[in-house]
Amino acid sequence: MLRASAMRAAVLHLTVALAALLSSCTTVSCLKIVPEEKQLILAEGSSLSLTCAGSSETTWDLKSDDVPFFQMKAESSDLNYKIVQSNSTASVLTLWHVDWKNTAVYQCREQLTGEIKEVAVFVPDRFSPQTLRFIESSHGMVTKTSGESTVPCVVTNPNITVTLYDKDTDLPVNGVYVPSEGFKAYLDYRTYVCRGELNGEVKESQAFNVYSIHVPEDIDAYVNASQTVLKQGEPLTVNCTVQGVELVLFSWDIPNRDIVKHKPETVVLSATTMRSCLVFPHATVAHSGTYVCHAHESTQDQKAFASVNITVLERGFVAVKSTRKQNITAELQENVELRVEIEAYPPPQIRWKKDGAPVRGDKTIIIRQEHEIRYVTILTLVRVRTEQKGLYTALITNEDDVKEVTFALEVQVLARIKDLTDHHLPGKKQLVTCVAEGVPTPTIQWYSCDSMLKCNNQTSLWQQLKADPELLSIHTSVTEARQTNQVRSQVTFFKPQHTTVRCETTNQEGLIDFRDVKLVSSSLFSQVVLLAVVLTLVPIIIMSIIILIAVWKKKPRYEIRWKVIESVSQDGHEYIYVDPIHLPYDLAWEMPRDNLVLGRTLGSGAFGRVVEATAHGLSHSQSSIKVAVKMLKATARRSETQALMSELKIMSHLGPHLNIVNLLAACTKHGPLYLVTEYCRYGDLVDYLHRNKHTFLQYYLDKNQDDGSLISGGSTPLSQRKGYVSFGSESDGGYMDMSKDEPAVYVPMQEQMDTIKYADIQPSPYESPYQQDLYQEQGGGRVDLVISDSPALTYDDLLGFSYQVAKGMEFLASKNCVHRDLAARNVLICEGKLVKICDFGLARDIMHDSNYISKGSTFLPLKWMAPESIFHNLYTTLSDVWSYGILLWEIFTLGGTPYPDLPMNELFYSPLKRGYRMAKPAHASDEVYEIMKRCWDETFEKRPDFSFLVHCVGDMLTDSYKKKYSQVNETFLKSDHPAVARTKPRLSSPFPIANPAFGSPSLVGLSDFPDPYNQNTRRFRNEAEVQEGVTSFNEYIIPIPDPKPEKS
């Protein structure tokens, strides 16, 4: 009690004295310590009060050799000092019961100006005041600089005489000794000791080793933790690392210091890297907070700090956020992306469900960790269908919490009128019934007009019908089905009408469908009908027969798109094609039907289907291989059978090539016609790009952090980078061709000729992710025909696809073969990113495919057709070059639909005639886009040929890729592949190599382009022919002269 009173009195006395002192301080330096002594000698067990005041807040620091900058706490129960903030600018440091351990330099720092004042305190040993004592240094190291260095041999009594000696030679060193700091001298890289002498007693200090260290201009500290979010009981490690300096001292500010016990450990990682570690084997909630690491380099007095925030949870959590509305409306065939952002710890399990059942089939699910506790999951529905509407739920769980997000998806189907009929009811009533379908449920409005001729051009003359008890009644009913909603509306006229009635339906603003029906009175109607029946019965029958024949002839028929050119006119604008019916068929292609085991349907169209099958006995090296079998439907007409037979003859005469879907065998006898071709397990290129788009974007999102690899506005084209391409087996997703959600039904092969029923074959689900070993055991894989095994879709892959398609088209052009439907949907992906060109029209419902537009009895892919094909019905290999440019646009937009800004109606033609061309895709380099523009030259003679395109695209590829392609091609041609083996006796294809000028820009046409790519066109083609290793001849096709370009 007396001690406390005395201390308060001393503090009051010092405060009054200090106030008087500060009243006279200048504006330059107001920081003062009272008492104003540079050093104080205290008796052991005594007390001391030091008051520091300035013009702003002041703090007390302890300066020592081991901890050059250690901020003292305001209060501490386990230490013999206390700091009291007497006012906003003054603080008092009180020491009591001091001993030799309190020997140190105490610093007062003004926060606003950074000014420092210090006082040295010495406490000699009370029991033996004359005893020599050095303050031990924990490291015994001295850093050498260009000037003086300080050996920190600090004593507890300033009266001790201290001398510095070289430990090895025992020779004294000249210098200056400061009791509170140590011995200052010019030192070498040696070991030194201090000797103290007092009243005849001599004692040596510990040894100090002098080191030379690299001192950077400034230092940076980096703090990281094993986890910034964790649960209590889990281990926690916090590291503070400093690089580029050889020696640095660490100190930590940690949360809840009174509760959390810590003992930092310093580790030297390398000659210029040090780390301080805090290790807590079992973290608690008290460990939550901000950890601040202070690093100090004492040679140049450089300081740095860094911090990290740690959160220790009592239990785990899950928090979710959807990035779009949860009630979603999508148009038919639109791609829908459902995205959920998640914060969770521990790491969550994420599952998607549709209407309570696990999601499977043609949906792409991405789960990506974006931060330590942040995740994102994306469910993508590609080309959404009506049956895919419903509730999609993302279920996120971990061991402590469960959350879910549900999206209600409605697939919008444009309203259309399905049926409009009128009936005469008893009592001279008339009933008009209109049936409309759509999603959301469409509305129906009724209108009438007395003059049909006038109303056709004057929509304002139509009068809306409303229910009237005396004239008419309107009754409407709605039926909701799984795929679409149906509305049935009926108008009943109570009196005979002689008018035109219109049914109009809509379910979207501005989009209306309507139909008209003309009503006549019942009496007049009966007379007209009777007279018509009597007078025109026979003519009607005759006309009906004629109409049926005409309709039957106009009905779209299956036809092979590929055409083989026989001859061309001198001006290059008239072509004669070979009639495939006149080509012979070699029975060597025949295979027994019982060697085929049919499986699931890969694709189905209006005319036929393609079925997966297992073929036995086609190859000597494999007992069975997986194949695709083309066949017609049971309703096929003779002309369609002839078309499929023509396709067989053309494919058999073309010969094998690595980049076309090759013919393997055929069954033409004793049953339906089968074409057995290669099986491409990853489907068409459009779906492949859609399904792997996320790997492309994620790959370059990761790489952008290092070298900005993704092609965009001003970035460096990837074509200028020679990247490494590895080769192995494909494993990027396992997607099947043309597959659906329904389970597959496998159909065994039967020897029942025409009695086989294929209607039961159902579309298959997508295969599970690729498993190479299993696939090879089934006989479907060829490990020596693999281009790339990269699981991600890269820019090099896009170039590789373009290159392989150009190689395949170069082969077809060399055979005078025009594809006429070159598009990404007709390019299939096989094992190892091997690309093959095909004509998949048989298994595609082109009558309901928006990519094909009806014209007469055929359907045309307008967006991919060259102008001369659209407007003049002229098809050449150069019109295929135009289509190749569109295919490049598809590839480098990752599966985009061409001409997204143009409608598919009569407005499509005008921009094309005016020279409209699509803009550069986001992922295409300038070189690739330049090739596209060359392919889209309006004058077809000026377009490059495929040999030139192979050269251009090949120049953008790495040498390793082209070398691997050549090795794969050579392996293919030397293998016992069924397509190669069946043509080896002939040594070549029956079609000749095209005339060097055919189907390519002549020298006159190319002279308009002073581009080095357009030189030596014949040389490119000749080199390509040598690489293919196939000598061509053909007795059916006459040589084709050079086309002459039009003169301007």
Swiss-Prot record:
Where does this one sit in the cell? Cell membrane; Cytoplasmic vesicle; Lysosome lumen
InterPro entries named in the record: Ig-like_dom, Ig-like_dom_sf, Ig-like_fold, Ig_I-set, Ig_sub, Ig_sub2, Kinase-like_dom_sf, PGFRB
Briefly, what is this protein's role? Tyrosine-protein kinase that acts as a cell-surface receptor for homodimeric PDGFB and PDGFD and for heterodimers formed by PDGFA and PDGFB, and plays an essential role in the regulation of embryonic development, cell proliferation, survival, differentiation, chemotaxis and migration. Plays an essential role in blood vessel development by promoting proliferation, migration and recruitment of pericytes and smooth muscle cells to endothelial cells. Required for normal development of the cardiovascular system.
Question: SUPFAM superfamilies attached here?
Answer: Immunoglobulin, Protein kinase-like (PK-like)
Q: Which residues cross the membrane?
A: 529-549
Q: What gene name is given for the protein in this entry?
A: pdgfrb
Broadest EC class assigned to this enzyme:
transferase
Q: PTM Phosphotyrosine: at which residues?
A: Y558, Y575, Y577, Y735, Y746, Y758, Y766, Y770, Y852, Y1036
Where does the Protein kinase domain lie? 596-957
Superkingdom of this entry's organism?
Eukaryota
Catalytic activity annotated for this protein?
Answer: L-tyrosyl-[protein] + ATP = O-phospho-L-tyrosyl-[protein] + ADP + H(+)
Q: How is it modified after translation?
A: Ubiquitinated. After autophosphorylation, the receptor is polyubiquitinated, leading to its degradation. Autophosphorylated on tyrosine residues upon ligand binding. Autophosphorylation occurs in trans, i.e. one subunit of the dimeric receptor phosphorylates tyrosine residues on the other subunit.
Name of the protein: Platelet-derived growth factor receptor beta
**Which residues are glycosylated according to the annotation?**
N87, N159, N224, N239, N309, N327, N457
Q: Which PROSITE patterns match?
A: IG_LIKE (PS50835), PROTEIN_KINASE_ATP (PS00107), PROTEIN_KINASE_DOM (PS50011), PROTEIN_KINASE_TYR (PS00109)
Which organism does this record belong to? Answer: Takifugu rubripes
